[in-house]
A protein has these predicted regions:
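Alpha-helical segment of the N-proximal tetratricopeptide repeat
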Residues: 6-36, 48-55, 84-91
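TPR-repeat structural position
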Residues: 23-24, 59, 95, 131, ...
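Amphipathic alpha-helical segments of tetratricopeptide repeats
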Residues: 31-35, 67-71, 103-107, 139-146, ...
């Protein structure tokens, strides 16, 4: 070891060793620091040890180190450790353990990590089809992201919540979520949110067109609604539904309405 290395703080030495690929040497230094209950660098060293051990293939050792860091309650490194645990459990498909680790992130309460934890919990709830819990967590990710400097995570949460709502026939609620997100989303997230908002409006339009037809409007209005509905549905990948709408109009018992629909159907022929 050179004289300059002897003067380097142990944490920096361990980092340099890890960057050079000497994971065993890095782990030895970090392990000593993490084992000192009174050491000022214990939390940071334990997180570093978790990363190094995971890179070495020692998953259980990495988790033990992460739990050591978490137990310190350090606002930065305990939160990092809980994230490390959660992401590892997710990779293995251990969703209950992952949920517990993400909740530990919330327990630490460090603002920079809270939106990420809410978003992860929302995704877990979505996969488990716990939709009320998912919505609650998505909204929490939006709120904490927007007000905690993590606007990108908040925008991602809004996009995923809106998609979930549209999947469950709630385009109006989805549109409200997206409009809220556009108030704080980073510039490069805005185009995607606007596309989603347009899709939500298409779904709303389809519902209004259908309601107009079912509401017994006059022949001209009903024919217009049928045409608009039939031409809009394919934009949402619903070509078969569009065909059924055309058939409904073309075969309608009201001859005046059917004639109006025929004119509109053959407009582009």
């Amino acid at each position: 070891m050179t004289s300059s290395e002897l003067e380097t703080p142990p944490l920096d030495t361990a980092r340099l060793l890890a960057e050079r690929g000497d994971l065993d040497a890095a782990a030895r230094i970090l392990g000593e620091l993490a084992a000192d209950p009174d050491g000022p660098d214990r939390a940071q060293a334990a997180v570093g040890l978790a990363v190094v051990l995971e890179q070495s293939g020692d998953v259980e050792g990495a988790r033990a180190a992460a739990r050591t860091a978490l137990a310190t309650g350090h606002p930065e490194y305990a939160a990092q450790a809980a994230c490390h645990l959660a992401q590892g459990f997710e990779r293995e498909g251990r969703e209950e353990q992952a949920r517990g680790a993400w909740q530990a992130v919330l327990g630490v309460g460090t603002a920079a990590y809270v939106p990420l934890a809410h978003l992860a919990l929302a995704r877990l709830a979505t996969r488990a089809e716990h939709l009320e819990e998912a919505e609650k967590e998505f909204r929490a990710a939006m709120e904490t992201g927007a007000h905690g400097g993590e606007e990108r995570i908040g925008a991602q949460a809004a996009a995923e919540l809106a998609e979930l709502m549209m999947d469950h026939a709630e385009p109006g609620a989805a549109a409200e979520v997206l409009l809220d997100a556009l108030e704080f989303a980073p510039g490069d997230e805005v185009p995607g949110l606007r596309v989603q908002l347009g899709i939500a409006h298409l779904e709303l339009a389809c519902a209004e067109f259908a309601e107009s037809v079912e509401g017994g409007a006059d022949a001209g209005t009903s024919a217009l609604a049928i045409e608009l509905l039939a031409r809009t549905l394919p934009l949402r990948g619903r070509a078969e539904d569009a065909g059924r709408v055309w058939s409904y109009g073309l075969e309608h018992e009201d001859e005046t309405l059917a004639a109006e629909v025929r004119l509109r159907y053959h407009r582009d022929a």
